[in-house]
């Protein structure tokens, strides 16, 4: 039941991870330190699920490095991808439009109220001081928004009136600001009167004397999204204010319009009316169709010309004040627009950090923890950042099918807690990392499976050995897109080649144009995979074929790209020879094992601040170029190939040499066969004189047939050797004839005199065996005749092996015994001369054979 529960829980988690609405994950980042101390990094691929984001502040992604908040936040796109946003300089012009984005906005509290210097203050101090104060006020307006404080009197009214005038420029007004002291005093008096009337009007409407300005300011360049909770009461009060000021027919929607570009603007619905409208009609907000854009709203103006006086004098004063202020604000607005056009800021999106930005993160050598948080911790994604030195080689390993025994079952069985990894893989990779190599785990899984993949690699333990830590590089695509590329299209090498080339460019930025794989500089030392696509990916980035290992489902490791693919091994056997395949990395040219750091290739202190570029002169380059791979036991000790443009002359010379060799071999074969036939005839003459009877006739016939066959062979060779016809015989026929006559060219050569002795000995042994077999047959027949008995009787003194079975009668009758003895004696007398004659004949015959078969010393010496 435990396995069932684990399986159900894992399936539910996997199904939820496949859902695009909840898919989240981040890919590990690699930072490479160069000899001059410069840092370069791989992309920050961070993906969140499709959360329901209502506020622009929720798009801000906080980045924590080693549990410390960094000062470089990221922004979340609508698709769930996070990216950095940086301001571009004026010198950057050729940037695609799709990379231009709005800045990162966050929920910030409203700016605190602070007293500001009005342009109307200090009027008696002279014109120069007034101009300085005017510039100071303009700078304040551009930097931060201004807010209306109802409790302020006097100066605040002039400030608000200045803001109101700046928002409603008129085209017809061309008056200049007051320069004399009298004009300034007149403007100041009118401002005070306007402020008093405005405060009296707001008090009658029962607007609160103090508004809550502690709400969040939610502004984004992509659009204005107000806070509904804070703006609800204000909308009601604004409607009541418009009703009291402009009548019952006034609607807030009539003041807000949208232009063709989608910008929201405030317009004057009564612009067709004149300024001298009768009392009771809404006053003129702006003339000549003046509009207010979103920039004006963000500048902080929240109030327009809302006052309306029942008396004519007040209306005249207010009208003159509005004209003066509108002319002043028109001049100021033109200056501000020109200045803003020159200093317009543009923001670009990116997923990489520069050298200066990386140095601000306070990184350490080896492994660093990354955490990405959205909306104050509602969604958190974690990953790792590895800082590596430029001179430490990398060993790549696939995960599915390379660490696991199969692609599919590696996912399924790992969910229920069953170990489905190859034996010895943890021990081998641990030894490789101990020798000073960096381990890189590469897989075509999607970024949403990053957490599950890392947890699986950390859980592998075999006989006390675990896999070493290393970056897990996954596909930045979603799960369905990654599965389609790997399962349906069966092209995982498309992602792997692009990813490895990107990592390689971190080490060698100036070698991107190298096309030849043999000449390509690469930081990768070896690669492990389970398919031919993995081998092709590793070979594309410059890994030699002799260091690309492919493992099958049975645990056999072989080198698939080598021409001699008969090499078979395993992780356990490679672990025994790990120092041969992966020699220890030397960090110092004097001492090879002086490094005491736990991080491969890093100094013991593990800090980036203590880097000294002068020590790189004494360091030795650890990357083995592909040129060194040409001088191995497999490649270097081969016979060099002849570099000749035209091979036709060589083919003709080879054909002539073959013909000459054929002629020589034919002549040698003829002479050898002739000598063998002569010696065979000499050997067969000796038994021909002494053999009698039928046996002698057979031997004579056999000897004569051998001589005839030998003579025929000699004649055939002599005829073929005397008149060789090269024109009618092809090269194939010549080679076949050489093979039939000389044997296989791979066989060991034999000396001619040894062949002659072998032939002579074989003929002699053959003749001797025939003679011995015929003599033995004759003697056996005679022995059987000699020992045969016709009648059975009592046992006698002469006992033979054949007569033992007949000695079964009793010995009771002496007469019978005497008779039997007499008959036996008579029979013995009759047979004895005959047997003696046979023995003499046999001895003489054997002696003759021995005399005939003796070696002739003269013949042997010849």
UniProtKB/Swiss-Prot annotation:
One MF term in the entry's GO annotations: transcription cis-regulatory region binding
Designated name of the protein: Phosphatidic acid phosphohydrolase 1
Domain of life of the organism encoding this protein: Eukaryota
Post-translational modification: Acetylation at Lys-496 and Lys-801 by ESA1 promotes synthesis of diacylglycerol. Phosphorylated by CDC28 at the onset of mitosis, and dephosphorylated by the NEM1-SPO7 complex. Phosphorylation regulates recruitment on promoters of lipid biosynthetic enzymes.
Region (N-LIP): 19-104
Annotated Polar residues bias: 105-117, 664-679, 687-699, 824-834
Catalytic activity reported: a 1,2-diacyl-sn-glycero-3-phosphate + H2O = a 1,2-diacyl-sn-glycerol + phosphate
Outcome (variant: residue 8 to A): Impairs membrane recruitiment
